[in-house]
Amino acid sequence: MKADEVRGLSADQLKDKLADLKKEQFNLRFQKATGQLEKSSRINEVRKDIARVKTIARQKAAEAKA
């Protein structure tokens, strides 16, 4: 997911996206623990996507406050 895609989302959509990513991260960690994970790089991708969503949500909140 690109940062431009995330910037186009509303605050509610960002919250939903964050929840989806956290669920995916949980499932990936579970698969890794049980030895079923095929693409281990996906864990890092999801972690960075979560950081992007949180960063942009914080920026939007700061802009709305200012």
UniProtKB/Swiss-Prot annotation:
Segments passing through the bilayer: none
GO cellular component, one term: cytosolic large ribosomal subunit
Any one Pfam family match given in the protein's UniProt record, by short name: Ribosomal_L29
Key words, A-Z: Ribonucleoprotein, Ribosomal protein
Entry-linked CDD domains: Ribosomal_L29_HIP
Entry GO MF terms: structural constituent of ribosome
Top-level taxon in the UniProt lineage: Bacteria
Gene Ontology biological process terms from the UniProt entry: translation
InterPro entries xrefs: Ribosomal_protein_uL29 (IPR050063), Ribosomal_uL29 (IPR001854), Ribosomal_uL29_CS (IPR018254), Ribosomal_uL29_sf (IPR036049)
Protein family membership: Belongs to the universal ribosomal protein uL29 family.
Classification via PANTHER family: 60S RIBOSOMAL PROTEIN L35/50S RIBOSOMAL PROTEIN L29, LARGE RIBOSOMAL SUBUNIT PROTEIN UL29C
HAMAP family, A to Z: Ribosomal_uL29
Protein name: Large ribosomal subunit protein uL29
Organism name: Agrobacterium fabrum (strain C58 / ATCC 33970)
Species lineage: Bacteria, Pseudomonadati, Pseudomonadota, Alphaproteobacteria, Hyphomicrobiales
Gene responsible for this protein: rpmC
